Amino acid sequence: MLGITVFTTFLAYASSCGAPIFQPNLSARVVGGEDAIPHSWPWQISLQYLRDNTWRHTCGGTLITPNHVLTAAHCISNTLTYRVALGKNNLEVEDEAGSLYVGVDTIFVHEKWNSFLVRNDIALIKLAETVELSDTIQVACLPEEGSLLPQDYPCFVTGWGRLYTNGPIAAELQQGLQPVVDYATCSQRDWWGTTVKETMVCAGGDGVISACNGDSGGPLNCQAENGNWDVRGIVSFGSGLSCNTFKKPTVFTRVSAYIDWINQKLQL
């Protein structure tokens, strides 16, 4: 009965997901790019850990229900205490209007997460309390299970990652256009080759626009035909050479490959 209740609740707000009050600027970039319009990606969260009595940004994530956040498995350490910052634009402003800080109840890391091969890089965070949705805090939509996007489909990566290779973490949320690179292309030898699996999705690779350190766990935002935004990917890895290497697009965990796993964890 509990599972039915949770799933029914999920369907109730899913109909209004992925619809920001403040519309995003759809021509911005991440690396070497521009600030996002404040609160135009209201499902974007900052995952923060406590060290020396200070909360520090470590990864991004996506609010998918008022109680749950999607992020990357590689963002999670059993030795750290976490909180989730919601409704944020500027991480340097602690009491930013419209923002909220929530503790963590449970973290579900995928049972088959492989840190060496970077497989199944997905985790679901259950928040310690239910978040009240607002103009600055909204949920993203989940894509249809198994669905794929075509080559060059326009998507946007968002995060507070480094503005450029070895540069500083961004204070204000960044965004950038990263078109999808299909599996047939991304798995070619001079791209990512066999490193990329069908449970992943690639985007970018033009040598200019890229996710960077600190963006990990954050969403690949793709607009559906109905105008709402789906979280199609979770930032997983990129080139070790630099943040924006030609033919080395950002690699994301493909969310549509894990819908069944996500739904199972939502019921726990």
UniProtKB/Swiss-Prot annotation:
EC number annotated for this UniProt entry: 3.4.21.2
Specify the glycosylation sites in chain numbering: 25
Query: InterPro entries this protein is in?
Result: Peptidase_S1_Elastase_sf, Peptidase_S1_PA, Peptidase_S1_PA_chymotrypsin, Peptidase_S1A, Trypsin_dom, TRYPSIN_HIS, TRYPSIN_SER
Tissue specificity is: Pancreas.
Propeptide stretches are 17-29
Every copy of the Peptidase S1 domain together lies at: 30-268
Q: Where in the cell is it found?
A: Secreted, Extracellular space
- Provide the reaction this enzyme catalyses: Preferential cleavage: Leu-|-Xaa, Tyr-|-Xaa, Phe-|-Xaa, Met-|-Xaa, Trp-|-Xaa, Gln-|-Xaa, Asn-|-Xaa
Residues annotated as catalytic: 74 (charge relay system), 121 (charge relay system), 216 (charge relay system)
- PROSITE patterns tied to this protein: TRYPSIN_DOM, TRYPSIN_HIS, TRYPSIN_SER
Subunit info here reads: Monomer. The zymogen is secreted as a ternary complex composed of procarboxypeptidase A, chymotrypsinogen C and proproteinase E.
- Similarity comment text for this entry: Belongs to the peptidase S1 family. Elastase subfamily.
Q: What does this protein do?
A: Regulates activation and degradation of trypsinogens and procarboxypeptidases by targeting specific cleavage sites within their zymogen precursors. Has chymotrypsin-type protease activity and hypocalcemic activity.
**Protein name in the entry:** Chymotrypsin-C
